[in-house]
Regions:
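Aromatic (phenylalanine/tyrosine) cluster motif
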Residues: 8-14
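Flexible, gly/pro- and Lys/Arg-enriched active-site loops
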Residues: 27-60, 65-182
Length: 182
């Protein structure tokens, strides 16, 4: 059998089994879709961190190993932390899986799962996602080495937007923007 047909069937079998699972991708993106530099966020936006905590608490979060390594205190509390890694099999406070499909298969088919980065995991998860929860930052970073994948406006509809100006805690204008898949 042709390998591409088997992969295609496997993909649709996985989707059929997980049709009720709600997968959200959450990220803070600059105007050029940059998300990080040297495994660090580009901008310090306390309200973005509050929104992240509010949305993800009580849910499963899936991330790559580098994203896990970037967390100052390790696994995030009050969430099921799932890490994708082919080289590490154990991390404190987290479950480790070799690939996204296996990680998603370990989740309940009725739960909401948040994909929290990084670049490679976002790219892998985008075809499965139901919602994008983006913080769109009105800035172009001087340096960036990680980017959010491009997504087609014909596949996504803006469902929420909340704009914020600069203030004493936020040096950049930003907007919380949610998109849902058509």
């Amino acid at each position: 059998m042709n390998g591409s047909h088997a992969d295609f069937r496997s993909f649709f079998s996985f989707i059929a089994q997980n049709i009720l699972m709600y997968i959200s991708i959450i990220a803070a993106v600059a105007k050029n879709m940059a998300i990080g530099n040297e495994n660090r966020l580009l901008y310090w936006l306390p309200n973005d961190l509050k929104r992240f905590k509010s949305l993800t608490t009580g849910h499963t979060i899936i991330m790559g190993r580098k994203t896990f390594d970037s967390l100052p205190k390790g696994a995030l509390p009050n969430r099921r932390n799932v890490v994708l890694s082919r080289s590490v099999s154990e991390l404190p406070g987290a479950e480790v899986f070799a690939d996204l499909q296996t990680a998603l298969s370990s989740c309940s088919d009725t739960e909401e799962v948040y994909i929290i980065g990084g670049e490679s995991v976002y790219r892998q998860a985008l075809p499965f996602a139901n919602r994008l929860c983006l913080t769109e930052i009105d800035a172009l970073p001087a340096n960036a080495d990680a980017f959010f994948p491009t997504f087609s406006p014909s596949e996504w509809k803006e469902s929420f937007r909340e704009c914020h100006d600069t203030d004493e805690k936020h040096e950049q204008k930003y907007s919380f923007v949610d998109y849902i898949r058509y």
